[in-house]
From Swiss-Prot:
<feature type="modified residue" description="Phosphoserine">
    <location>
        <position position="574"/>
    </location>
</feature>
<feature type="domain" description="SoHo">
    <location>
        <begin position="166"/>
        <end position="230"/>
    </location>
</feature>
<dbReference type="Pfam" id="PF14604">
    <property type="entry name" value="SH3_9"/>
</dbReference>
<feature type="modified residue" description="Phosphoserine">
    <location>
        <position position="328"/>
    </location>
</feature>
<feature type="compositionally biased region" description="Polar residues">
    <location>
        <begin position="83"/>
        <end position="92"/>
    </location>
</feature>
<feature type="modified residue" description="Phosphoserine">
    <location>
        <position position="577"/>
    </location>
</feature>
<dbReference type="Pfam" id="PF02208">
    <property type="entry name" value="Sorb"/>
</dbReference>
<feature type="modified residue" description="Phosphoserine">
    <location>
        <position position="27"/>
    </location>
</feature>
<dbReference type="InterPro" id="IPR036028">
    <property type="entry name" value="SH3-like_dom_sf"/>
</dbReference>
<feature type="modified residue" description="Phosphoserine">
    <location>
        <position position="378"/>
    </location>
</feature>
<feature type="modified residue" description="Phosphoserine">
    <location>
        <position position="239"/>
    </location>
</feature>
<dbReference type="Pfam" id="PF00018">
    <property type="entry name" value="SH3_1"/>
</dbReference>
<keyword id="KW-0472">Membrane</keyword>
<keyword id="KW-0963">Cytoplasm</keyword>
<protein>
    <recommendedName>
        <fullName>Sorbin and SH3 domain-containing protein 2</fullName>
    </recommendedName>
</protein>
<keyword id="KW-0966">Cell projection</keyword>
<feature type="region of interest" description="Disordered">
    <location>
        <begin position="216"/>
        <end position="285"/>
    </location>
</feature>
């Protein structure tokens, strides 16, 4: 007996097969609607079974099958149907009315679950030992013209089974099931290999297709049976009734309604001896890197596991049809590796590409090619492809490549050349590829491993040290290690120099050479986009980084070793060899390395190449310039002269770089010299010319520092260079990788000042400056300079003529500096430890700080009842020095000099402003006072300051707070809020808590006891005050304009002593402040010029003697003699109105020498009386 695919037994004369009880699952993936008008499937089923019942169930063997556990299950078509009934056909046949019996010819074995609504393209037909009473299958029958069919629920029940068994269908022995017209229905032919069929369906289910490639799964589509290989209408064969019909297979996932893809139609049948459950593990081929930085071109494992021909064929197929996701790509190539032969013609890509020929010989239309990506140079399962991008071999328009068989017409034979290129590891240039618009280099893994010694194995980001180390000694053919467009597009043959132009949009052929040579072309001749792209992205790092501008210790050491090889000191020893360094050169190398390390601690070595011409002669390893240029200069300049025949030609590049350095041309070849850091000064002073550096914000901060010579490097680098007699290029030597916004403010500010000076500067005069004073000129000048190299004998002979001009310029600069220092010192803002302060102190004597002011006077013993004398016993100027106390502060603070007279009469308690309890010397107190004097002028006069006593220690936590200790006197300036005062202590102003101090009741004005007046010699006249005069001391008489004064005596030529009638006020006042209206004849004759010491000392010395002992060296007899003569050594300009002006060689009669270093005397030249610094005069 035999069984058909439906599981029903029938008699066959051909063979006898033993039945085995195996559960069988089959499905029909392509069930499509065949027509609009058909009868009800229920009636069709009944009519068919009435005609030929043994076709459905088998005639004589039904009982035997039932006994073995197989039941005949017929669908019970319920009356609940859609209004539109569609006739069901199998396999998309679009013929006339076809009987649906062939669809229902197999009994159902229901599954344990219901089908999802989304997977309703077919009904799974299954045998089972136990059947449920009823189960619904929802089938959407679709018509050919795209209209939606009806959902037909299928029910099975025992009642319907009994009704169906009596129906018979027409039977044609030997032909198989037929429709009403007698045409055999479609019978599956692959039942002998069920696993292969289910595997194909499983792959179609789990494949993610391109959006829009297929229509909605519910839309009607027509696929003729001739285009499928799974089903075809034919008569019964041996495979229909084979024993494989009952082979047990696992229950599959219900397949979706997916039309067969064009690639699947051409799949060949797998061999019977293949493993039945063989699955392709794609993880080893598709192990994607975790990040893009781990990706290494050429290291994909697919290159080691698959054949290049298969790679190429599948890549061509993929290049013409790009799937939209990595999942579909993975599925496509997984099937192709299993089903397609290794070598074969390309399959047609559906109806769209069926007319195309194999692109192996297809003509590529040159630069007007419509292919986006032409040739795939790697496996489809490479990591980059798994991420959705194609690493493809780019032909025009951006870059051209020709292999061994490349032709200018651009035929696709270069694909074959590329395959041959993969097999030539030694003599091949890296293929230039593009990924998403950026270049990447991909090459076979075998080539990378075989050429690792001579070719750089990777193209990736490299450090500066690695880029600098890849030199001609290490690599005979160095490669550009850069990601930039310019460097990858511009790879050239490094063994012979040729003019480089930008990549031509046409494929070029280089005869006699297996490598394509990409040539540069001027940006102005290239298309507009390429020109713009060049200006944006052209940073050829081979030109930039393979220079001898070395910036690290490692690079310096390698450079030093290379120079030793050039000199022949190492006798063939190379830095790349494993041999030890010769023993005799070790000490020299160590000392040299120490120097290099010391140099590397400072800024990068500017190098001699900064002032040397550009090396236009190509070196041995190709185009390797000797210096680094700015990006702007590389972008703006045209193609430089790079051919050896053009190298000797004099040229001068006027680039558009805003910052340039012009170097003169007459230069003698210099022998290589090593300058240590100590030689810098000598080298710097060898040059006699300066040139201003024009710049803009493009200049980096390091360039500015280079200009201002702040580096500790010698001006000449330690690299060996070849100099040529021609004009130099103007270039910005820049070690900055980009713009430095941080340096913009400082640099542009200096540039404004520089350009303003530059417009008014005399160039010939500047060129004649003496080099001997160049260091001082650099110190003095605030403008950065760049030296010109002038080593010609003509310039050296002119050095002797420029000393006078340099001296004049320096004298003017020093004068400005002195004026500035003096102004700063007068304001008190010049620190004592500043270099300018020390410089001036060497030129002029230090003016002593005055303790003979009013505040010092109030610290004298006459104020001891209220203000005790400091413990250091500081002595003060005698009271008769009326000029000493006129101003309260020393000469170091001229901004507070003329403002304290207006409150001189109210100094009773206000003069206790200074903290007398402080043990510090009064000089420091005056210094602190000077810092707060400006605040006093701003509206807080000392009479408004309220004294307060600190009841607790307070330590300032911030700079705004004021520290003091318990018992200190603090002067309150104002009240900040309810908790804080602003006050003054020791000359410092700050805030402190209110609760930390206790206000003091202001005492009565503390006026010293006035000495009894001497015997009056008689009135000498009367005078009227012309101006207001405020007394600074208690011996002076304050005047108001218009006051009438009785003149008692003439103290000296500058002072009168008098009194105001009607009051007890008496004192001295300046002669110039009053106008004499009445003069007694006797008094005028008796005292035409009264002796100053006698009359002056009678009042003042009495005051001194009544308070403290008289100083040694100052006696009454000395005063009687008119003073001790001194001669002025320097000019002194008064800074306060009580000071005496001195001119050099003036003779001054000194009346008193104060302990603070100031003298009191009268100038014989001007007849003025005042104070002056004691170190400005010498004894005669």
């Amino acid at each position: 007996m035999n069984t058909d695919s439906g599981g029903c037994a029938r008699k066959r004369a051909a063979m006898s097969v033993t039945l085995t009880s195996v559960k069988r699952v089959q499905s029909s993936p392509n069930l499509l609607a065949a027509g609009r008008e058909s009868q009800s499937p229920d009636s069709a089923w009944r009519s068919y079974n009435d005609r030929n019942p043994e076709t459905l169930n088998g005639d004589a063997t039904y009982s035997s099958l039932a006994a073995k556990g197989f039941r005949s299950v017929r669908p019970n078509l319920q009356d609940k149907r859609s209004p539109t009934q569609s006739q069901i056909t199998i396999n998309g046949n679009s013929g006339g009315a076809v009987s649906p019996v062939s669809y229902y010819q197999r009994p159902f074995s229901p599954s344990a679950y219901s089908l999802p609504a989304s997977l309703n393209s077919s009904i799974i037909m299954q045998h089972g030992r136990s059947l449920d009473s009823a189960e619904t299958y929802s089938q959407h029958a679709q018509s050919l013209d795209g209209t939606m069919g009806s959902s037909i629920p299928l029910y099975r029940s025992s009642e319907e089974e009994k009704r169906v068994t009596v129906i018979k269908a027409p039977h044609y022995p030997g032909i198989g099931p037929v429709d009403e017209s007698g045409i055999p229905t479609a019978i599956r032919t692959t039942v002998d290999r069920p696993k292969d069929w289910y595997k194909t369906m499983f792959k179609q289910i789990h494949m993610v297709h391109k959006p829009g490639l297929y229509n909605s799964p519910y839309s009607a589509q027509s696929h003729p049976a001739a285009k499928t290989q799974t089903y075809r209408p034919l008569s019964k064969s041996h495979s229909d009734n084979g024993t494989d019909a009952f082979k047990e297979v696992p229950s599959p996932v219900p397949p979706p309604h997916v039309p067969p893809r064009p690639r699947d139609q051409s799949s060949t049948l797998k061999h019977d001896w293949d493993p039945p459950d063989r699955k392709v593990d794609t993880r080893k081929f598709r192990s994607e890197p975790r990040s893009i930085f781990e990706y290494e071109p050429g290291k994909s494992s697919i290159l080691q596991h698959e054949r290049p021909v298969s790679i190429y064929q599948s890549s061509i197929d993929r290049s013409l049809e790009r799937p939209s996701s990595s999942a579909s790509m993975a599925g496509d190539f997984r099937k192709r590796r299993k089903s397609e032969p290794a070598v074969g013609p390309l399959r047609g890509l559906g109806d769209q590409s069926s007319s195309r020929t194999s692109p192996g010989r297809a003509d590529l239309p040159g630069s007007s090619s419509t292919f986006t990506k032409s040739f795939i140079s790697s496996s489809p399962s490479s990591p980059s492809r798994a991420q959705g991008g194609d690493d493809s071999k780019m032909c025009p328009p951006l870059c051209s490549y020709s292999g061994l068989n490349g032709t200018p017409s651009g035929e696709l034979e270069c694909c074959n050349a590329y395959r041959q290129h993969l097999d030539v590891p030694g003599d091949s240039q890296r293929a230039i590829t593009f990924k998403n618009g950026w270049q990447m280099a991909r090459q076979n893994a075998e080539i990378w491993s075989s050429t690792e010694e001579t070719v750089s194995p990777k193209i990736k980001s490299r450090s500066c040290d690695d880029l600098l180390n890849d030199d001609c000694d290490s690599f005979p053919d160095p490669k550009t290690k850069s990601e930039s467009m310019g460097s990858l597009l511009c790879e050239e043959d490094s063994k012979e120099s040729c003019p480089m132009t930008w990549a031509s949009p046409y494929i070029q052929e280089v005869c006699g050479n297996s490598r394509s040579r990409l040539k540069h072309r001027s940006a102005h001749n290239a298309p507009g986009f390429l020109k713009m792209y060049k200006k944006m992205h052209r940073i050829n790092r081979k030109d930039l980084m393979n220079s001898e501008v070395i910036c690290s210790v490692k690079s310096r050491i390698l450079q030093y070793e290379k120079e030793q090889q050039h000199r022949g000191l190492l006798h063939g020893w190379s830095q790349s060899s494993t041999e030890e360094v010769p023993r005799d050169v070790v000490p020299t190398r160590i000392s040299e390395f120490e120097k290099l390390i010391q140099k590397s601690k400072s800024m990068p070595n500017l190098g001699d190449e900064m002032l040397s011409p550009i090396t236009l002669e190509p070196p041995q390893n190709g185009l390797c310039p000797k210096r680094r240029f700015s990006i702007e200069s590389l972008l703006e300049e045209e193609t430089q002269v790079r051919h050896p025949s053009q190298g000797q030609r004099s040229c001068k590049s006027n680039t558009l770089v805003p910052i340039h350095i012009e170097v003169t041309s007459d230069e003698q070849p210099r022998t290589h010299m090593e300058f240590s850091d100590s030689d810098q000064d000598g080298v710097v002073s060898d040059h006699s010319d300066y040139v201003h550096v024009e710049g803009s914000s493009f200049c980096s901060e390091s360039d500015f520092d280079h200009f201002s010579f702040t580096s500790s490097e010698s001006f000449y680098g330690s690299s060996h260079h070849h100099h040529h007699h021609h004009h130099h290029h103007r270039h910005l030597i820049s070690s900055c990788k980009g713009r430095c916004p941080a340096s913009y403010t400082r640099f542009t500010t200096m540039l404004k000042h520089e350009r303003a000076k530059h417009e008014n500067m005399d160039r010939p005069r500047r060129q004649e400056m003496d080099p001997g004073l160049s260091k001082l000129a650099f110190l003095v000048s605030p403008v950065p300079f760049r030296r010109k190299k002038i080593l010609t004998p003509q310039k050296q002979t002119e050095k002797a003529k420029c000393k006078a001009s340099v001296v004049e310029a320096l004298d003017s600069a020093l004068k400005d500096i002195c004026d500035q220092i003096k102004a700063e010192k007068r304001r008190g803002s010049l620190p004592d430890n500043s270099i300018l302060h020390r410089l001036i102190s060497e030129l002029l004597p230090q003016i002593p700080e005055r303790n003979s002011s009013l505040h010092a006077l109030k610290r004298s013993p006459m104020h001891q009842p209220f203000h005790p004398l400091p413990p250091d016993g500081a002595s003060h100027c005698p009271l008769y020095q009326n000029d000493c106390g006129r101003m309260p502060h020393s000469a170091s603070f001229p901004d507070v000099d003329t403002t304290s007279n207006y409150h001189a009469q109210d100094y009773g308690s206000a003069l206790s402003l200074q903290d007398h309890e402080s043990p510090r010397s009064y000089s420091s107190t005056l210094t602190d006072l000077g810092r707060s004097a400006s605040r006093e002028r701003r509206g807080t006069p000392e009479k408004e300051k309220l004294p307060a006593k600190a009841v607790y220690d307070f330590k300032a936590q911030t700079s705004k707070e004021l520290s003091f200790k318990k018992g200190d006197t603090v002067y309150i300036l104002r009240k900040i809020d309810q908790n804080w005062y602003e006050g003054e202590h020791h000359g410092r102003v700050g805030i402190f808590p209110i609760s930390y101090v206790e206000k003091l009741t202001p005492p009565e004005k503390a006026q010293p006891a006035r000495p009894p007046p001497p015997v009056q010699p008689g009135e000498i006249g009367e005078a009227i005050a012309k101006y207001n005069f405020n007394a600074d001391t208690n011996v002076e008489l304050s005047l108001r304009k218009g006051d009438r004064i009785i003149l008692l005596k003439r103290v000296d030529q500058n002072w009168y002593e008098g009194k105001i009638p009607g009051t007890n006020r008496q004192g001295i006042f300046p002669v110039s402040y009053v106008e004499v209206v009445k003069r007694n004849a006797k008094g005028a004759e008796d005292y035409p010029d009264p002796p100053l010491p006698h009359s002056y000392s009678s009042d003042r010395i009495y005051t001194l003697s009544s308070n403290k002992p008289q100083r040694p060296g100052f006696s009454h007899e000395n005063i009687q003699g008119g003073g001790e003569p001194f001669q002025a050594l320097y000019n002194y300009t008064p800074r306060n109105e009580d000071e005496l002006e001195l001119r050099e060689s003036d003779v001054v009669d000194v009346m008193e020498k104060c302990d603070d270093g100031w003298f009191v005397g009268t100038s014989r030249r001007t007849k003025f009386f005042g104070t002056f610094p004691g170190n400005y005069v010498k004894r005669l």
